[in-house]
C-alpha cells in the first residue's frame, strides 16, 4: 500500500485477480527475463522494441507467473509495481515536490526488503526529469538499491547510452521483435474466448487469419 499504490499499479495483484489476457508464445523472451532477474548482479531487464511489439504483455505475463507460483524460488514473493512518470509528475510542477515523491517511492522499495521490482514503462521519460528525481532513480539503480524492469525503444536506448552510460550498464537489454505471423495468430487464438464472451460474438478461424494478414500489410 502507501506511496507505491498512490503512484503505481501492482501488476502481481492484478494478475492474481485475472486482469490480464492469457499469454501465448514468447517463451524465449520470458525465459530470458527470468534468467536476468534471478542474477545476483546485472539483474535489471530492459525490454527494447518498437511500440506494439508486446513488451508490456511480457511484463504482465511475468506478473501472472509470479502470482501463480511458476517462477524460481528467489522470485516467488516478488511484487511488480508499474511506476509511471506521468503519474509521478502530475500536479508536481515544482522540483521539490517531485523529488520528495521519488524519494518516498525509492524508500518504499528499499523498505520492501527486495520484494518490490519496479516496472518503468517509459524509462527515457524518467531520465529526462533532470535535476533531482531522474538522478535519484539513476543513483538508486546504479548502486543496486532498487531492482527494476524497464521498457524503451531502440532510439531511446541510444539516448540513454549517450546521456546516462552508468545507468545503462545496470540494465541488460533484451530485444523484443514483432511477433511472426504464426505467433500473432497464436496470440489471437489465446485471447479469442475472452473477446467472444465480452462481446457476445463468435470469431472464426479465417477471421483471425485475415486479421493477421491485414495487420502485416497495413499496421
Language model regions located:
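N-terminal pre-P-loop "Q-motif" helix
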Residues: 2-6, 21-33
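Pre-Walker A (Motif I) flank of P-loop NTPase domains
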Residues: 19-20, 30-33, 39-45, 114
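Walker A/P-loop nucleotide-binding motif
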Residues: 28, 39-61
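Loop/turn-to-beta-strand initiation segments
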Residues: 43, 78-80, 111-118, 142-150, ...
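Post-Walker A helix-loop "phosphate-sensing" segment adjacent to the P-loop in P-loop NTPases
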Residues: 63-76, 88-89
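Conserved C-terminal "switch" segment of AAA+ ATPases
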Residues: 72-73, 159-162, 166, 173-219
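Short glycine-rich substrate-engagement loop in P-loop NTPases that contacts/grips substrate
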Residues: 81-110
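Short regulatory helix/loop adjacent to the ATP-binding pocket of P-loop NTPases
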Residues: 130-131, 140, 154-170
